[in-house]
Design a protein with these regions (language model features):
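Short, flexible beta-strand-to-coil junctions
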Residues: 30-32, 93-96
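Conserved P-loop
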Residues: 1-61
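Conserved RecA-like ASCE ATPase "motif II neighborhood" in helicase/translocase motors
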Residues: 45-89, 96
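Aromatic-residue detector
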Residues: 9, 21, 76, 90-92
């Protein structure tokens, strides 16, 4: 699994887009239009972008996604997914 953890303005998105392209992965993000524009600016084509909402609907309806997945800003995705239920205040993660 790839983890891109870095500060602002450090090309995290372009690196994640390259990973998505190389792994034929769906790029899950909050704003697909903005990411499509960025991908074109980076010269990256052939990436399927899916919003958090679309991704959740596919998982809910099909129970799976038959492609690899990368998620831009995992914390935002978690907040989007669970925020109506409760307030997300922390998590842990293991280094690999």
């Amino acid at each position: 699994m790839y983890r891109i953890i870095d500060g602002r303005e450090t090309s995290k998105i372009s690196r994640l887009m390259i990973i998505a392209k190389e792994n034929n992965a769906v790029f899950v993000c909050s704003n697909t239009k903005a990411m499509e524009i960025k991908a074109r600016a980076y010269g990256l084509t052939g990436i399927l972008f899916m919003s958090y909402h679309e991704f959740n609907n596919v998982i809910r309806e099909k129970g799976y996604l038959d492609r690899n997945v990368v998620i831009d800003d995992l914390e935002d995705y978690i907040n989007y997914t669970i925020s109506p239920t409760f307030k997300f205040v922390g998590y842990s993660i293991s280094e690999e």
